[in-house]
From Swiss-Prot:
Record key words, sorted: Calcium, Cell cycle, Cell division, Chromosome partition, Cytoplasm, DNA condensation
Alphabetical list of InterPro entries matching this protein: Chromosome_partition_MukF (IPR005582), MukF_C (IPR033441), MukF_C_sf (IPR038198), MukF_M (IPR033440), MukF_M_sp (IPR036141), MukF_WHTH (IPR033439), WH-like_DNA-bd_sf (IPR036388), WH_DNA-bd_sf (IPR036390)
Stretches assigned to coiled coil: none
Location, primary (coarse class): cytoplasm
Protein known as: Chromosome partition protein MukF
Subcellular location: Cytoplasm, Nucleoid
Annotated GO biological process: cell division; chromosome condensation; chromosome segregation; DNA replication
UniProt cross-references to SUPFAM superfamilies, sorted A to Z: MukF C-terminal domain-like (SSF140570), Winged helix' DNA-binding domain (SSF46785)
Similarity-based family: Belongs to the MukF family.
Signal peptide per UniProt: none
Subunit organization: Interacts, and probably forms a ternary complex, with MukE and MukB via its C-terminal region. The complex formation is stimulated by calcium or magnesium. It is required for an interaction between MukE and MukB.
Listed CDD domains: MukF_C, MukF_N
Region (Leucine-zipper): 208-236
Organism: Histophilus somni (strain 2336)
Length: 440
């Protein structure tokens, strides 16, 4: 995000002294967005007051407001946008009564937030990452050639600071816009399901699939370019090792690496969260369908009982085996058919029994860790626990342990946005990607 050399008290006092305030109603915001669109269509970027009044007249008609007071309300809206520094007004004695208006950086930023930042696609992301790769490539080549401090500031620091960092910030902002878009889709799905869920199932499926596809496509693009960008940054970092006068370059490299890790990490986390929401919606739909069938059956049964003496009937009850639910969240351990009888020591244990045993084991381990104030290395815990169970049960055991560990603690490195490394947890190639849990 944006770096600043000012402290929080300085910014607070600066805002207080200038009496900054922002307040945009829906009508005023629509007016500002219309001004921004109109401004983009003009070559000079300047607007007259008559242009703004015409734009406001269209807004007023859209909001079905009175046409008799358009001029007065337009002047009030224009003055309010000028007061809040969304518009700049220019006038002189030579142009008395004829003012010229231009959007301020604040006006451009707010309108850009609502208009352009939603245009986030894999193509745009690919272009941005391509530009970043070229800039970092040139900066790494310049770093390997070397030079004085002025050379480093011009050929290495400047491209990274004012091109690469800004594109990273743009990608980060776009991700936050996608987060907001996901919330909007969730609200839309909730509204569909509360109105008429039977006809809304297809629409819900489409929204879920489109969002999942977009998230995966964008994350694949990030993953494909992430390693290459990190390797180029490491090349530059190697060149500044041992040069104390180039501390500003080293600090910038560290910041860029953290930003890139944070972008990639949140992209993957957003996918995982959306998968969980997808399962939740499908579970709700399944439950709703089952309940609806039960309501129809119970209604017909009540009617049949009520008219039994007029239309006698017989009732047969049958219980069919449940079909396998591919979206079932509660996984079970693998059951294999066996011939003959087994002693009690080898009888099959249910997942619930294993879950209780592992929870007790984890609790006893965590008590020791808390008393000794020792971080929990999840890979070591998994390795030790998996040795006690057959290979066929490793996946379920690991899932239970990870679920308990995540509920009981977190890692400081996760909060810092550091990407964890893969570590082996058994002899058959299974790996886990998790930081050491050091906060309970």
């Amino acid at each position: 995000m944006l770096e600043t050399s000012q402290t929080i008290p300085e910014l607070v006092n600066w805002t207080r002294e200038r009496e900054f305030s922002l307040s945009l109603s829906t009508e005023r915001l629509a007016f500002l967005l219309a001004i921004a669109i109109y401004n983009n269509e003009r070559l000079d970027g300047e607007m007259l007051e008559t242009d703004l009044i015409d734009i406001f007249r269209h807004i007023s008609n859209t909001f079905e407001q009175s046409a008799e007071t358009v001029s007065t309300r337009a002047n009030n809206s224009i003055n309010e946008l000028v007061k809040q520094r969304f518009l700049n007004r220019f006038s002189s004695e030579f142009t008395e009564g004829l003012s010229i208006y231009r959007l301020t950086p604040l006006g451009v930023g707010v309108s850009d937030y609502y208009i352009r930042q939603r245009e986030f696609s894999a193509l745009r992301l690919s272009v941005q990452l391509s530009i970043v790769a070229d800039e970092i490539q040139r900066a790494s080549e310049s770093a390997e050639e070397g030079g004085d401090e002025h050379y480093w500031r011009k050929n290495v620091f400047a491209p990274l600071k004012y091109s690469v960092a800004e594109i990273f910030d743009s990608i980060d902002l776009s991700q936050r816009m996608m987060d907001e878009n996901q919330q909007h889709i969730k609200e839309e799905i909730a509204e569909l399901l509360t109105k008429d869920w039977q006809t809304a199932i297809a629409s819900c499926e489409r929204l879920l699939d489109e969002t999942s596809g977009n998230l995966r496509e964008l994350q694949d693009t990030l993953n494909a370019a992430g390693d290459k960008l990190q390797s180029q940054l490491l090349r530059i970092q190697d060149c500044v090792i041992g040069h104390d006068n180039l501390y500003f370059v080293e600090q910038l490299i560290v910041d860029l690496q953290a930003k890139l890790d944070r972008i990639i990490s949140w992209g993957q986390q957003a996918i995982d969260l959306w998968i969980g929401y997808d399962r939740h919606v499908h579970k709700f739909i399944r439950t709703a369908i089952d309940l609806d069938k039960n309501r129809v059956f119970s209604q017909r049964l009540r009617q049949s009982i009520h008219h039994y003496f007029d239309h006698p009937w017989f009732l047969w009850i049958a219980q069919a085996e449940r079909l396998i639910d591919l979206r079932e969240e509660e996984l079970t351990l693998r059951e294999e058919e066996a011939l003959g009888e087994l002693p009690e020591e080898l009888q099959y244990e249910s997942l619930a029994d294993l879950h209780e045993q592992i929870v007790e084991t984890m609790q006893s381990l965590l008590i020791e860790y808390r008393l000794q104030n020792t971080p929990i290395d999840l890979s070591e815990v998994l390795t030790a626990q998996l040795k006690q169970y057959p290979l066929a049960n490793h996946f379920d055991i690991a899932r239970i342990i990870i679920d308990q560990a995540v509920r009981l603690g977190l890692a400081q490195d996760d909060l810092n946005g550091i990407y964890p490394n893969w570590r082996s947890i058994n002899e058959n190639g299974a790996e886990v990607q998790a930081h050491v849990i050091d906060k309970y």
